[in-house]
Structures are given as C-alpha cells and as structure tokens.
Amino acid sequence: MREGRWVTVTESEFEHERRGLEAIRQKLPDGDPWRAWSNFTFTANTGHVREVDLLVVAPGGLCMVELKDWHGSVTSENGTWVQTTPGGRRRTHGNPLHLVNRKAKELAGLLAQPGAKRVWVAEAVCFTDNGLRVRLPAHDQNGVYTVDELVDMLKQAPSDERRRVTAIGSREVAAALKNIGIRKSDAQYKVGPYELERKSFDSGPTWADYLARHSDLPEAARVRIYLSERGSDASLRQSVENAARREAAVLGRFKHPGAVQLKQYFPSGHAAGPALIFDYHPHTQKLDEYLVQYGEKLDILGRMALVRQLAETVRSAHASRIHHRALAARSVLVVPRSRGGKGRAVGEEAAWLTPQLQISDWQIATQRSGDSSQGQGMTRFAPTALSAMHLADDADAYLAPELTALNPDPVYLDVYGLGVLTYLLVTGKAPAASQAELLARLEAGEGLRPSSLVDGLSEDVDELVQAATAYRPGQRLSSVDEFLELLEVVEDSLTAPAAALDGPAEDETGASADKDPLEVVAGDLLAGRWEVRRRLGTGSTSRAFLVRDLEAETRRTRPLAVLKVALSDSRGEILVREAEAMRRLRPHSGIIRLAEPEPLHIGGRTVLALEYVGDERDDDGPGAEGATRPRRREETVARQLREHGRLPVDQLEAYGDYLFGAVDFLEGEGIWHRDIKPDNIAVRIRPNRTRELVLIDFSLAGYPAKNTDAGTDGYLDPFVDVITRGSYDSHAERYAVAVTLHQMASGELPKWGDGSVLPRMTDPKEWPYPTIAAEAFDPAVRDGLVAFFQKALHRDAGKRFPELKPMRDAWRKVFLDASQTVPSSHRTRPAAPADGAAPAEGAAAGIADAEPETAEQQRDRLAAEVTRDTPLTVSGLTPAAQSFLYGLGITTVGELLDYSRRKLVNAPGLGAKTRNEVQQRQREWGERLREAPVSPLTPKGRAEAKEELEQLTAAESALVGQLATGESAGALSARTLRSVSLDTLATVLVPAVNNNGSNRNKAEMVRLLLRLPDEHGVLPGIGVWPKQKDVADALGLSHGRIPQMLKDERKRWKAEPAVQALRDEIIELLASMGRVASAVEIADALAVRRGTHLAGREQRRAMALAAVRAVVEVEQLVPQEVEFQHQPNRKATDESLGAGLLALDVREDDAPDTPTAPGLLDYATRLGKTADRLARLDTLPTAATVLAELGALTVPPGAVDWDERRMVELAAAASVNAAATPRLEIYPRDLSLVRALRLTQAGLVRWIPGVPEGRQPGLTGEDVHERVRARFPELVVPDGRGGTAHELPTAGPLTKALRDAGFELSLSMREDTGTLRYLPTRVDEASSYLTTGAWRQSTRTGTVTRYADDPQLAGAVRAEERLLASAHRDGYRVLTVRQQLVRDAVRELGAERLGGQAVSVTELFLEALHGQVTPGTKPTWETLLKADAAEPGSKGAVRFAEYARTAWGSVEPRIAELLGDGGGGAGPVLLTEAGVFARYDAMGVLDRLASAARRGGRGLWLLVPQSDPSREPRLGQVAVPYQAGLGEWIQLPDTWVGNRHRGSGEVVASGVEGDAK
C-alpha cells in the first residue's frame, strides 16, 4: 500500500514498531476500499485520550490493530498474559485485547453519524516477531495474529454483505476521521510541573493513569486524570468531579504506609478534568499480576503476612472513620521493599517476597466525619447511586453484592473485600470471572473455600474467608478487628507445629538481633529482653507489638508490654515527642504509662516501650498448648460502640465519669491530650476479670498550640482557629470530650448543617450548635443530654462551660435527675464482681466485669426456652440488646416479633454486633413462635409486598401498591424496579383471585407453570421447568387450553415495567457470563440480588426460577423481537439442570463477530456430551485432561470469550450427569460417597498435642460434609427410596462410609462442649489419618515440618510433600537441582517411595543418531561428530540438523511409550541429561511430551541441573517452559538431596487416590 492511502500520522519513535508497520504496509492491497492510518490519537466521548498503532479499512470493515514486539513465549495464567523472554525473565501483562476492544468501540461511537450507515471497528493484536511461541488458551487467541495471519484476516470477505465497506464508504470513513480530529501523538502531556508519557498505563470508565516525571526534579509520579464524558448531563459531570475531590480529600487526611501517598491535587490541572499526583515506584505491580510472577515462591505464612498488611491498613482507615468500599485486586499495589534490618539493602527476590502493599482507588470511599474544615469534603461529596461508575470493570468479581444498594454498611463492604483478597492471596485465583457468577455460586451454597483449590490448607483459613465473605452482611464478621483476631488464629495454627519442636533454636537471639524490628514475628527476641508475642497493628507512624518483658521480675514491672516501632526516621521523632510528654505525667491508673522512660534504639529503629492495656487474664504463666482459655483481645470504647451501639445508661454514666477524671488529671499536670476519642480509650481486663478504662496514644500531646490542625477530624473543634482564639486551648480539649460523650450516648457524631458547607460557614443564628442525635439517646436521659450537648458544643466558646468542673457537674446532674424520676425504660445494672474479686485500684464505678466464658451458652439456653410473653430480661439477649430494645418500647419477645424488621435495621444508635444479635434472635424465634412465610401468594404475602413497595423509596411513595395490584408502574424508576424482591414479583406474575373466583383456573395455571409454592408452602411436583401438558393434567384441562390462557398472561407480563426491568437484568447477567448460562445459574444470581423471605434453598431457587421462566415466556411472544433463546435439558439426572440453558442472540449493537444463540447452544450441547463421557471414566480426569478434551471441540463461528473455568462450568451445566470441581475436574454427580471421602481425605483428624482425649476437638460430621462439598459441591447420595438427595448422611451411615474409605473413626462426646465428634478408634495406631497442621506428619518428637525454624529444612519438607503428591499421578514437573548433586538427586528420585524411572535423554539421542550410520558407508560417525561442531549455517551444520531431526523422530515415541506404560499408578518417567533438547533444537519435542503427560498416564519429571536451583529452570541458554499455575516447577534444595529432612523424623504425606490432582 502506497503513501497517501497509508497515512503515517506520526512517525513511530520505536524501531521495532516501524519494522512491524512496514511489514504490514508491504502486504496490504493498494486499491479501494483499502486505507490505513498509523500512530495517531483521538479523544473518546468519555474524555480518554486514546493512542492507536494502526487502523485499517478493509472490505470486511474497520480494524484497529495493537502491535506487540514480544520475544520468547507467551502464556496465560489466571487470565493474565505472561511473557517469558529468551533470557528466562517472566513479565506479566493484562490481556491487550480488552483495551483495544474498548478503544475500538469508542472510535466507532465517534464515527457514527446521525442517519448514516453504522460503522463497525474490530480489534486485533499483532505479534510482529514470528519466532514468538504463542501458547495462549483458545479463548485468548481470538483476535491474536502474526503479521501474515493479520493480513489474511483483513482480506477475508465480510460475513454479512450488508456490512461490506465500499469505495464510497471508505472515503466517508476518511472524512469522518478528519472531522473527529485524529492527530499526531504528542510525545508528552503536562499537568502542573509533571510531563506525562503519551500512553496511559491504566484506565477506568472515568479516569486514566499516566506515568509522569517532574520537569525540574528527578522524581517519578503517577498522575490520575478524571474525565468527563462529552454531552453528559450535569449529574454525571458532577459525579466525576466529586470522585476526584473525594479521593483527594480522603488521601489528604489518611496518611498511612499501607495507602498510596497523594502528593498534590489539581482541580483544574488538565483540559480533560481534575488531576491527582501520587508517589510512584517504577516497579509497582497490581496484586493479581504480582501473584502470577511471585506467587509460587510465597509460602502460606508469607501470604498471610500480606493479608495482615491489608487488614491493618483498613483497620487504621476505619479508625479515621474512612471506608474504602471497593477493595479489589487492582486496587492493591505491590511495591518491593527497599531495605531490611538496620537499613541494609535487600536482594531483588527478598524485596519482592516481603513487599509493601498499598491500597489505591479511593474514589468511592466514604468518611463518616464530623465537621472540621477538611472533613466537610467527604460529607459534601459523599458517594451516590452514580459512584459505582468510577470503578474499573476488572474489579467487578471482588465487589460486595450489596455495594449498589441504597445504603450499604461500609464496614461490611470492607470486611468482604478483605475476605475475597485473602482468597486471592491464598489460591492465586480470583473468586470468579464476574460478580454475577460469584453470586450464583454463593446462592447455590458454594461458599468461598480456598481449600477446594489448595491441598493441605488449614481449616482456619477457610473459616476466615467464609466468615468475611458471607453474602448476607449480617452473617459476616462485624469489624476489621474481628477479622484480625481470626487472622491471628490462622497464624497460630500455621506456626503451631514449629512451636512443638523440643528446645529453642540455638541462635535465636542472634537471628532476632539481625532482623528489622518492623518484621519480627512471634518468638523473636529484641535487644535480648523483649520476647515478641504477636503483632497488634500498624498505624500512620508506628507498628505495635505485644511483647513479654523477660526482665520484668527483676525490675518488678508488669510482664507484658507494647513496643511501638517507628516506621521511618522522621516518624521516630514523633515517638520521641510522645515519650517526652508522657515522662512529665505522674502515675495514674487511668493513663497509660511508659515501660521505659526513654525511647529505645533497636535494629536502627526508634522504639517506644509502653505498658500493655488489654486482656491480662492467664498471662502470668504460659497456658497449656491447646488450652481453652479465652483469646486475648484489645478492646477500646470505639470497638464497643461499633459492635454494640450506644452505651447503656449506667455504663454511659461510668465511662463519662472516668473520662472527666482522666482529663481533670491531665489539666492538673498541664498536658493536653489533643486526640481524645473512643479509639484512644482502651479497656483493661485485669486477671481478676475487673475492668478499667485507660487513656492511650499521647502522640499529639507535644504539638505546639499554634498547630490547630493536629487531631482527628470530627473531634477537633472546628472553631479553634477563629480570630478570638487562634490556637489550641482548653475549650478545644473539652469540645473533643463532649463529642466523645455524644458518640458514647448515641453511637453517632454531632453534625453541623447539612454538610454542604464548612461548619464555620453555617449561619450562626440557625446553627448555634450542631444537630444533636436526640432520637438515638436513651429516653431516660434524653432531655438532659440534649441540653448538656447544646451548651458543651456551642460554636461560641464563650457560651460553653467555662471550666471542666461545671461541665462535669452538669454531666452528673443528667443522671441524678434521671434516677429521681419514674423510669420509662429498663436500665441495665453492672454485673457483680466475682466472689473474692476486689475492684481494681482506680477502676471507675459501674464498669462491669468481663463476662464469664459460659455466658453465650447461658444465653442460648434461655433463648431456647422463650415464649411470646417472655420478658426481654430473661430472653437470653445481651444487656446492650435489651437496653436498645427498651428504648424502642419493646419489652417482650412477642413485641419484638411484631416489630418491623426494616425499621429495626435503620434504628439510630444500633451497633453491628447488637443488630446481628437482635436480627438472629428475631429470625430464630420467628421460625419457632410465629407462622413463617410460606408463600408470597397468600393474603399476608400480598400485603407484605405492598408494604415493601411503600419503603423502597420516599420519593416514589405516591406510587404505593401499583405493582402488587397489577396497575401501571411506569412512573417507578429503573433503579427502584430492580430493588423489587422476588416475593413481590410473584404477586405481579400471578393474578390475585377475584372475589367471585372467575379467574381461579388462570391464577392456578400461572402458579403451576411458574412452579410457585401454594398457600401451605408446598411446591408443585411437576419438575423445575414444568411442561404445559403437565400443568393441564394437574388442572384437569385440555392440553390446548393452556396455550390460550398463557397467551393473555404473556401479553400482560410484557406490558409490566417490573417484568421489563427483570428482562433487562437477565440479559445483562447473560452478557456478563459469556452470553450463555444455565437457567439455574441466572436464578441463583437473581435470588441474591433481589432476595426472598422464603428460607429453604429449594424454595428460594423456585422463586427465582419462576422469574426466569416468566421472562422466557414473554420472549417467545413475538419471535421477531427475540434477544435470547432457551434450550431445556430434560434428560438431566439432577432436577435443577432440567431448567436448561439460556443464550444471548446477536443484537443490533453487537459486533460482527458475535456468535449466534443457536451456535452457542449447539457448542454447549457438545461440551455437555464430552463432560458426560469424561464423568463415566474409571479414573477421575484431571484438570489438564478435562481442558484438553473440551478444548479439542470445534468452537462456533464468532468470538467466544470464555476462560477455562467458564468452559468447564458450562460443560457440566449442559450435561446429563456431570459436575465440575473448583479445580476444574469433571466427576459424576452420583460419585460414590466412599470414593469422595477418600479423594478429599475428609477423615483426617486434627490432633492437638498435650490436650486430653476428652477435650480434643476432633472432627464433627459437619466438618466432613464441608470437606466433601468443597471439592464435590453437586454430589448426590442415595436417599433410600430409589432416588437421590443432596443432603449427606450423618451418624451411623457416615461412620460406615468413613470406615469403608479407610478411616477407622468412632463418634464420641466432647467433654467441654457436649458436641459429638469423630476421633480415631485407636490413637496409638492412627498415624495414617492424624494431622497436626496443614500436612499430616509423624507425632514423634523431632519431626521436621515445613514450618521448621531452619528455612533449608523447611524447604526440603515442602519439596518432599510436592514430590510425594505428584509421584503417582499424571502431569509434568520440572525439577531444578544443584549441578554437583545431580547423581545423588537421581538416586533419591528413584527411591522406592517416589519410584522415578531414570531415562537419559542424551543416551537415547546418541543411540538414535548412531543408528543412522551404516558401517562401511558415508557419512561415518566421525564425520557426523565434526559436522556437530561446524559453523552455523554451513553445509555440514545443515546436514547434521537433518540427522538430528530424524533422531528425535525416533526418541520422542520411545519416551511417549514409557509415559503410556503402567497407568496412572506407576512412578514417573525421570528425564536426565536433557540438555540435548536445547542444544539440538528439540524444545518442541519436550513440549509435546509434557502435553502428553498432562493428559494422563505416568508423570513426566525433567531434571534440570543448575548452579542455583532457585533460579528459573534453563537448559543451557534456553528457558524451560512450565505452567506455574499447575505448580510444575519444584526446587530441590541441597538439604532434600542430602536427606536431612528425613534424618530426624518421618514426614507422612497425605495419601490420596491416584486419580486426584
């Protein structure tokens, strides 16, 4: 193609790009309609400035091409593309097709002219290096080409002649491009003093991130530019501006090493919109990309350390009342650590294995702020319904289900985010491809269990993830503090085996001395004195550790202390200032003390030693391993408010009295705390169980009074720096006290104005004081508290209390007046001290003792005995719940059951734990004491549907009842329509019976067809997708009558706005699931999104399937308007699969390469048949076999964008009897329970050393069920009546199945809890099914574990475990070993326990080569040897290459034959002396052998000798390919080869069935 037709808008600055473009230009035709433009930019309607490498106009349409000059090989791991360079370095890339697709759609939108012919822009990625080995899965190869393949694709005729581009159309495109303003690619852009790179490296719907450099200083930065869409309405533009200001305001306030650091905010910094400048490390990676590159090198403890980093950052944000709300893999940045202990530099790998995580993307964060000057930004620009539009698409799978609800709890959103990120860190995989897919799995009962993907994982990790990610917020952990406590349990369980070893490590002190104090772990010793117990958390200036002072006895001090380690030298100065302030204080029981008067200097860090304030019970001596003493926790008043809501009146009086006493003491000492708030009031629990409050954190006490900004937003007096004051004073200190008291009394902060302006900008006449949360106060003290706070929080300091004493007297008077009047509510009383326990010295009166351990059991017993008339005082509710309910006028259980659940949830002053407790009891008692909802079609159900609509939105309250009565709902917004529950939808779909009963048959026909429960809650017994014939038979009507009646209902449904909104939602779900999904999968997603009051899983699914069925029926009304098709699966053995599949058809706005619905359904059918064939195999097929078999099927025409997991799931959904495990194995749904128990090793019993047998936790039946369900979620068992059931057996049948599976277990009662659990029948002979940690091992003293203190021994054990796990399975493994130890390694690998069959590849090759030489003929053997050393390209070298290829043709089938021998149970084929693969250009042979091993038969092990086994495997100078996601690389440390790990004990690996993987 000549210049002119090919327009080079900008000459590329890269030589490789110029070469690639020239290669394409030479091959393109030079005639109409062909045209091309290279290297230009355009500005999309969204505001994004897009860079385009090449745009080609061809007869088949327009194509946007992204050029990639990659070398080596490219693979895909968990959706991330990984390039392995010829030098062996791995580089991660996002799938470039996604961005090109987005840019193509944006350009097509610009080219679209009103009234003109629609222009389609396809997308393509072109690899310009023909030597690149592309090993992408089939779904990732759509749109990926070499130069020749690209040109061939462009020359193809259009699939639809209506879309052919003619010469005239080509000229119109050229004119349109000129009109939209394609232009030269500016090399740089500017924002303030920063010059931007020309391509953004990341982007979202409303923003783009650029790398930038300062024009004058040598510093790099990340610049985020927020973009406003052209022509968007004012609300959208305002939402974008607010997102930018919100992110800037949050990060301007929240300074923490675990959050990205904002450098500067330019509200008008760029022509496109606001700009934010962030600090940026050039090697920063996103979390999912980091795990692809370094995940294999992280052990489970390293992964948990990263989880802790994230959780501590989020906890610190929550302490500042900031909530991220949208945690996802892309919002976590990974930065290599720059230094180790004592400031020493660390190596590259060590820097990446202990990185710093930083949370980014705070654009939809919230801050529940008070009203200081900075805080108003967060209130003024609070997230709205439009906020989710600012999130990138790849965050979708990580977002909490309720994010888009009207008012979701931000704490629960962040807890959920931490849970899914924990799942990602542990498994290396995202929880799902999309949120819709994940919701469907959650509704189907498949919780997130990392152990379903990772062998040998601690059960505590599963518990942590499941407790954080329950899809009902009320069932999640209620705070990040609880998450961290459960994380500590996980860390304890992971490190427990190492603690069981006899004797301390000899070099313990020395090892700890060299460690960076910031990185110490439990057991480390600092400065020879402080023994680390655990890490408490990380703040903005320091990291805190709980330690035991080994010199406490001689110094006569408390045994426990807290060390605050400064995060940097500058932050160390803050600790020094804090110590100076605290040294001036005399001892006081209510004020935290220094354990050491001067700051310490340990390991190059400044360290402050403080007394420990927390749970001191049972700390004077180490408890027995496994003892059941209560877990220590650090409690603050803030945590108590978060979990239980406002304080009961008696506690409020006592806590307030304490606070006044502490502040009075500080005034006498001449000190201002300057940061008084509930977070800084700790609760000490003494050994005798009494409590006292302690004021902590004096880090701001030494700040100059002129610095009026120091403090926490919301508690800082917003009028402190007015002209009449100008510096911090006692009024400001008392203002913080008043705000803290207000929060204790109500659970809320006072608020100035409506949040639209700063507090000092409010009208003094209208706002002399803030809004007091009077409704949240206890009625007994409400009037007195309102008067108190109106004076204490007055904007004019002259009208406040002049001194602390009158303020304290007024506070006491509130409670004195309340005690002298007839109480209108119950008041709680503090618990009496335990017998013989005297109150702690200085403890405030009225602070209740710590609750006994059995309190929860006592409450459960009381709750089980209640009736409707039972008073709340004896109902088993906690005092906090009782106090709150009394405030609502509720005094009995019956009154609570009759109270509206919705009103209860929204009541002010209610804490998270208290809310969960009340809701749980309300559900529990409701099921037992009142009629549970059985069907929405009862009169009561229809009335509740009407009530639901009344509460959907206040703005639309005039439309009450329109849906429930079948009237027009056209005025309801789409957002409101999508909030309608499934119960209310059922009342829309099924007409109410007339008074005269004339439409009774029609109503019953609809109910039966949709399979909705009757008035007794019974579902029709005619299948999950009833046939019209069955409905007619059930009603006694003719078969022809049903279609007639149904036609009228279809018309009515089609006209209903609620059904239209439901149809749009289902189409969106289909699009997000790859255009095909099972009806059940769609239904499960709807059940989570919409909700239903029915409790049973079968009933919930039936309600959702009814909604899907109605939309399918409506779709069939007008065939010409069909946008999706339905295909039933009548032969399925599982009833739920009978509902069949839905497939999205090609629509008006879809791309030309979109596959049709019939094509997709046919493909799914073929996948289902293949899955059924795999399920019938005698051996459970591995993931590699499944993917190979399914991948071999012909894909329908068009782009099918399914990842491997989606393909396997759809194959199972379209099958008759197949199901898929989370590991992508295929199994029959009626798999034998005995075999399932054996495959999952569900009978392994956790045995805690040192704990008596009667108190061993053992293994409960529920534990066994969970282990089986985690691996085989769709397993069914015989029900004894000729059918099958999902419920797994219990008691005797389960015990028999366990014994048949090889686990000799028996049921017995646990003494301390009274629960039934399994224990080994004979403990002394049970070593084959005991586990003491993540992997089973011998219980003999001296056993070496993967948690051994010696990392070399631990590495050897890990290698042993992985070798044993793969020795008798198919698959491919690359083993790296030190070069000098090859012979010993071969001997160990060939030992009986591993059974490797050593095969010398060099010997086979030479034998095959020698076989081609006939004695007495030419060439001779000597001639061949000379040719081997000939110059490359010479005649001899070319001739030798021919002989080598022939030799490999003989070697490959010989090795393949070995792989096929012996079946899956034989030992692996061990390839040694394999360097000839690389030397004689036979890496392709190795690839084919590896692929064969992955498909079944014997395993293939490749031994690769190297100078350093920890380096990426290489044969000579050639990188050895392997799949990291399948764990195919195993490092063999010197300790493993030397058998040191087996010298002092025997490692017993979990024996699994040979076909497991």
Curated annotation (Swiss-Prot):
Region of interest called Disordered, as start-end residue ranges on this chain: 615-634, 821-861
Domain NERD positions: 12-130
Binding site for ATP: L536, G537, T538, G539, S540, T541, S542, R543, A544, K564
Biological processes annotated in GO: defense response to virus
Alphabetical list of Gene3D superfamilies matching this protein: 5' to 3' exonuclease, C-terminal subdomain, Phosphorylase Kinase, domain 1, Transferase(Phosphotransferase) domain 1
InterPro entries: BREX_PglW, Kinase-like_dom_sf, NERD, Prot_kinase_dom, Protein_kinase_ATP_BS
Disruption phenotype: Strain is no longer resistant to plaque formation by bacteriophage phiC31 (a Pgl- phenotype).
UniProt keyword Nucleotide-binding present: yes
Protein name from the UniProt record: Probable kinase PglW
Taxonomic source organism: Streptomyces coelicolor (strain ATCC BAA-471 / A3(2) / M145)
Source organism phylogeny: Bacteria, Bacillati, Actinomycetota, Actinomycetes, Kitasatosporales
